[in-house]
Regions:
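Beta1-alpha1 glycine-rich phosphate/pyrophosphate-binding loop at the start
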Residues: 2-74, 162-183
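Short hydrophobic core segments
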Residues: 9, 99-109, 150, 229-239, ...
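Glycine-rich dinucleotide-binding loop and its adjacent helix/turn
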Residues: 108-166
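A Rossmann-like FAD-binding core segment of flavoenzymes
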Residues: 28-30, 75-93, 99, 166-262
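Residue-level detector of alpha-helix initiation sites
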Residues: 12-13, 38, 110-112, 132, ...
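FAD-site-proximal beta/loop scaffold in flavoenzymes
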Residues: 121-143, 214-222, 227-306
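A short alpha-helix-loop-beta-strand transition element characteristic
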Residues: 30, 58-61, 255-257, 311-321
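Active-site-proximal substrate-binding core of FAD-dependent oxidoreductases
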Residues: 284-291, 306-326
Length: 326
């Protein structure tokens, strides 16, 4: 008899927590955790905070040590899943191999939203989503250099605080009328603006980026009103896009994220999903929502693990967020 196998696609917070919770819920079959980044799964929230500021090493960010996965018989596989064959209950990997599953969990996360702006491919323009991204930024983050951060959300402001602490001259460009407009009240926006300006960060609102210019590397950020802002380094933080392409190609329901119910089930009863890649209807609010938070990813991972094990659990926690600046 073929042993049961749970395959988890995506080895960030949701995937790693789902794997651990499968064992906690009593899953005795195989557990395979597939990720496209080398090394052990790590926490992403510190990337724009302590890791960028040089206060933490990558080992400090690990969700669990290697011994945990060994003791729990969780197989870590460095590969990219290229296709899901639902009728055969099989996934195709970038290595050329295939892997069958009894239950499949999609924890594919999200990627940094790219700007369609002229000059965006110039050297010195970065996005911040992975540890490798941070290492590139840190290599260029020397005191006295001018960094322009496009986007005044949590990532943009946390990055601003970290780079300011490294002695850089920091300018934040926000297209709307206030920072954190999408996620907080005006009072909170005003608080963060005051804190940043007090630390010497220049906050510019209603600032629309028209283009980036430079000779090989970025030298200026050109605004829609014609103003040019000198820049030695640019960090773009304008949100994320859920990684739903794999699910969509497999015929699963997608609506601003992989659609799941309150038990983390997708439109296929043998496939669950958790984390930033999902959207679900919150009973409290009565509408579908996609949450980009580690707390939500952790809760969904617990529920998804219970569902795989045939137990009833439901996504119910209120969304909450935190930030660490200065």
């Amino acid at each position: 008899m073929t042993p049961e196998r749970a395959v988890i696609v995506g080895a960030s917070h949701a995937g790693a927590q789902l794997a651990a919770n499968l064992r906690r819920e009593g899953w005795s079959g195989e557990v395979v955790l597939i990720g496209d980044e080398r090394g052990l799964p790590y926490h992403r929230p510190p990337l724009s905070k302590g890791y960028l500021a040089g206060k933490n090493g990558l080992d400090d960010l690990l969700i669990r040590g290697a011994d945990f996965y060994e003791k729990q018989h969780i197989r870590l596989l460095n590969a990219t899943v290229e296709a899901i064959h639902r009728s055969a209950k099989r996934v195709s990997l970038s290595t050329g191999d295939t892997l069958t599953y009894t239950k499949l969990a999609l924890c594919t996360g999200a990627r940094a939203r790219r700007l369609p702006t002229p000059g965006v491919d110039l050297r010195g323009i970065h996005y911040l989503r992975t540890a490798a991204d941070v290492e590139l930024i840190r290599a260029a983050a020397t005191p006295g250099r001018r960094v322009v951060i496009v986007g005044g959300g949590y990532i943009g402001l946390e990055t601003a605080a970290s780079l300011c602490s490294l002695g850089m001259n920091v300018t934040v460009l926000e297209a709307t009328e206030r920072v954190l407009e999408r996620v907080t009240a005006p009072e909170v926006s005003a608080f963060y603006t005051r804190i940043h300006r007090g630390e010497g960060v220049e906050i510019r609102t209603h600032a629309l980026v028209e283009a980036f210019s430079g000779n090989g590397g970025v030298q200026e950020v050109v605004l829609a009103d014609g103003e040019s802002i000198p820049a030695d380094l640019v960090i773009v933080g304008v949100g994320v896009v859920p990684n739903t392409e794999l699910a969509s190609a497999a015929g699963l329901s997608v609506d601003n994220g992989i659609v799941i119910d309150d038990q983390a089930r997708t439109s296929d009863p043998d496939i669950v999903a958790a984390g930033d890649c999902t959207s679900h209807t919150m009973a409290r609010y009565g509408w579908r929502i996609r949450l980009e938070s580690v707390s939500s990813a952790g809760e969904q991972a617990k529920v998804a693990a219970a569902t795989i094990c045939g137990k009833h659990s439901a996504i119910a926690a209120l969304p909450w967020f935190w930030s660490d600046q200065y």
